[in-house]
UniProtKB/Swiss-Prot annotation:
Gene Ontology CC: cytoplasm
Chain sites annotated for binding carbamoyl phosphate: S51, T52, R53, T54, Q78, R102, H129, P130, V131, Q132, C263, L264, R291
Family annotation (InterPro entries): Asp/Orn_carbamoyltranf_P-bd, Asp/Orn_carbamoylTrfase, Asp/Orn_carbamoylTrfase_sf, Asp_carbamoyltransf_Asp/Orn-bd, Orn/put_carbamltrans, OTCase_ArgI
Protein function: Reversibly catalyzes the transfer of the carbamoyl group from carbamoyl phosphate (CP) to the N(epsilon) atom of ornithine (ORN) to produce L-citrulline.
Pathway assigned to this chain's UniProt record: Amino-acid biosynthesis; L-arginine biosynthesis; L-arginine from L-ornithine and carbamoyl phosphate: step 1/3
Name of the protein in question: Ornithine carbamoyltransferase
The keyword Cytoplasm is annotated on this UniProt entry: yes
Amino acid sequence: MRHFLTLKDFTKEEILEMIELARSIKAQTKRREFVPYMENKTLAMIFEKSSTRTRVSFEVGIYQLGGIGLFLSKNDIQLGRGEPMKDTARVVSRICDMVMIRTYEQSKLEEFAAFSQVPVINGLTNEYHPVQLMADYLTMIEYGKADSPVVAYVGDGNNMTHSWLMLASKLGFTLRIATPKGYEPDPNIVEDAMRFAKESGATIELMHDPKAAVQDADVVTTDTWISMGQEEEKEKRIKDFKGFQVDTILMSLAKKDAIFLHCLPAYRGYEVSEEVFEAHAEEIFDEAENRLHAQKGIMVWLDRKRGES
């Protein structure tokens, strides 16, 4: 049985299998053909962190696959009142067929998976956001930006940065990360990525100059400067991230046909300018929709692997 906790747990071939499955299911969906790959199966969706895209895409996704989505906030279950994660895992996994968790610490997610009898999907943690990267890569394919691309990430060294590190190092493309000093990605995750990069031929570059990162890039991406739980740091972060906004001047350094991606929600005037966001709105909202399709591919792939075990 396999879980989907972080992309470092998968080979290049497995990641591409899930992507191809997502593309196939998306094509069926666009033809209004809803194949019940997960008929009568239940996806438990546990949310310790609130979300728009994660809840909507998983709930609609499992429904379109013929299953049922069960939304559980931390206030709906005993987890929010101190029940150990391992006990919640034992109960939920005996009743449901798959579990998606959106939480804070990666260690919580991994503890749940260790005691679960069914596949567990990472809907987001402080350390990683792998389902978003699957949607991003699906979008890159659709825009013709998946053949040895140069991807530039500008901003905070957060869970999105960590997930880009995993994707690039597994698939073998070039990733440039520009962060302010003091906001670099986790060195342990960087170390993992560098090790994977040696095997895949990926090029990983960390720097503090956004202009150097974006130069001739095929894909430019960023994320919020102030993640959930960092609200008290807002003023300091705005000051520290000066010069790291993806605006028209910075974007002009990328290739003329470069695309811009953002996992949303976007805070215009901070990490991205209004002009850049609206100029690339089609890509951004295709990316948001692709959460639905990428996650369906992941769920079906995991369900099949469970059936094989």
